[in-house]
Amino acid sequence: MIRRAAFAGSWYPGKASVVKDRISGWFHEVATNGVEKVKGVIVPHAGWTYSGRIAAEAFAHMRGMDVERVIVLGPCHRYYTTKCMLTQATQLQTPAGVFEVDTEAQANLNKDGIYGMCRMRDEENEHSLEIELPFVYELFGDKVKVVMMMVGCVNTKQKEMYAESLVPYMKDPKTVFGFAEYIEETGNTICGHNCIEIYLRALAKSGLSVKNEVMMYGQSNRVESFDETSVSYCAMRTSIE
């Protein structure tokens, strides 16, 4: 079963050549230090017009890494769930090519039945995970397998539980993570904060020595009066020390 690239052509380009040129151009603007040891990135999930360049700033630091698995977490916007949901798809479409889903890893994560399985129509109606996949494909092509995790409204106990399930993959040097977030509107609100909390808890439980850095920050609008609002976007990376 394949998950279609439902937002290609609207939230980001639908043609493979345009996607490749856009991402490679953005990557070319990012200064990196050879092959880096990146464990994960936190990137925006808005349309590329608003935040694609900012997302590229973090993803670019994964260039050249020897990776077998990418775990992507993103928030639910379109429907309500109190669980983390895994994909039912076995393949994931992008404009440039198709990923295989790491069904073995998903089964291992869900060995205790703590995850739900997302209905395809709900998953294809959610942009937060899909919009990151072309960056992953540009970095690694179809040599990597992908785990898709849609994060719902989970409580503190659940965050601990999901973080614990991710620890073996956090320790695996050939697994990297991508997290979709942005700072939503004006004020202290983050769309995707549950994803970030699970990630940070898993990092802490793993015992890895890491460094978290803000790579780039941007805004949809420069607020000049109290009547205006703005959406802010941030790209971060976690490096192994």
Where on the chain are the PLM-derived regions?
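Active-site histidine-anchored catalytic micro-motif
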Residues: M1-R201, Y217-R222
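Long, Lys/Arg- and hydrophobic-enriched amphipathic alpha-helices
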Residues: V214-E241
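Structural signature of cysteine-dependent C-C bond-forming condensing enzymes
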Residues: L203-E213
